[in-house]
Amino acid sequence: SIMSMANLEIEQAAGSNDAWFVRRGAGTPQDGLAALFRLMGVAEASPHATAPITTRRVRAGVALFHEGTCAQAVYFIAVGTFKLMHTAEDGYEQVLGFAGRAEMLGYDALCQRSYPTTAVALEDSTVYALPVADLFGLSARVPALGRVLHLAASRQMLHQVEIAHLIGLGA
């Protein structure tokens, strides 16, 4: 269902009472990509910075995306924490990590077009969603978005190195 409220559209996720999307119209500095740039610490004065961006709110215990499903978007966590996990064939769920504010989710799905993990909100959370179909074109038009993607991917790689180091030390 969709309802409009003063330049704000709320669309409930199909088949779910727990997740919903919020689309903000452009027009104020708080709207659009500028909010994502602020979250990630990237200064941008481009007129494209007010381009609308989808905000998705996810209640605690609800999956943002499921392992094996087609990658629809890359997400940046504005508020909240997510658990990333893999489910084995026997149903065993292995926690692979956690992600919090200003971290990116779903970027690892771009190379195989499906999410390799499931991301579940550990608390009521809010994410910015960048549709995969628009990601590269938008990055070409808005260079700051490319910087945000590179910064977030670099942070993820650093985090993985830290985890590998801890595992190697037996900590």
Model-identified regions with their sequence ranges:
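Residue-level signal for well-ordered alpha-helical positions
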Residues: 110-111, 122, 138-142, 163
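Cyclic nucleotide-binding regulatory module and flanking cytosolic helices
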Residues: 2-60, 103-105, 109-110, 141
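Cyclic nucleotide-binding regulatory domains
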Residues: 62-123
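A generic structural signal for short hydrophobic patches within well-formed alpha-helices
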Residues: 104, 135-136
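Polybasic "coupling" helices that flank or enter modular domains
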Residues: 140-171
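Conserved active-site beta-strand element of glycosyltransferases/polysaccharide synthases
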Residues: 128
